[in-house]
């Protein structure tokens, strides 16, 4: 009886520890498009008869590779578990998310999802996968980003409110800021515009809630010291991902002309800082390939120019672990 009681005590202690952890992933998927044309969207680049020859076979390979990437993000020194929350950028539509969560390698994970329906010209959006067993959805809403002068329609910001197992409410914001097309200086006001919209939403949230717990993540198309991120810091957000590396040579989430940089970021409010136990780039070896031009390694992307590379993404995922 004593042995049995000891076993149950240890088991309950293990479950208590396991339930008090949260794994969060951010990933730009690099053009996760299906093979069908969406009316009024410029998705012609990813159709079967396009120069990329984006076929059903390539599409399903891509879905399973994204699933493989997400699954790999659940591994750490204490074992493996599926991520609880996954923020995805560059996702085309609901059909893609249905296939990813119900028919790909992730089908047994039982993820639920929410996403934006933006006016982005290419039709790409952001989406949040979540495990209903560790994150109970309260509500999700879209923060509209109305283009300023000379700015093309871009992705809206996704705000998701959910309850975690401790009973705390977590507010998650997911964004994909405008690219640096036209140059960093020219495009900087567009990213500042998105950040100002985010900060305004955070202001409203803080007026409605007492000391809300905030997590902001996504592809900011800016670095940790960029003006748009500086604005976020002024609003009391802490960049947990600044300066993090991978274990296999990655010094950023993205590599351009041989230089590593992190366009992807994860920020938290001050009241979440003590919960953070780890933040890193997942540069598992299967996500990398040799950089034959500049040396070292680089993300094994799906396309090199127009050449199909049968890879994963041009971005590496960020992995954040919280313990509460």
Please give the residue ranges for each predicted region.
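Structural recognition of the beta-strand scaffold that forms the well-ordered cores
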Residues: 23-26, 84-89, 112-115, 127-130, ...
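Metal-dependent phosphoester-hydrolase catalytic domains
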Residues: 23, 200-214, 221-324
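Structured beta-strand-rich core segments of catalytic domains in phosphoester-bond hydrolases
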Residues: 29, 85, 91-177
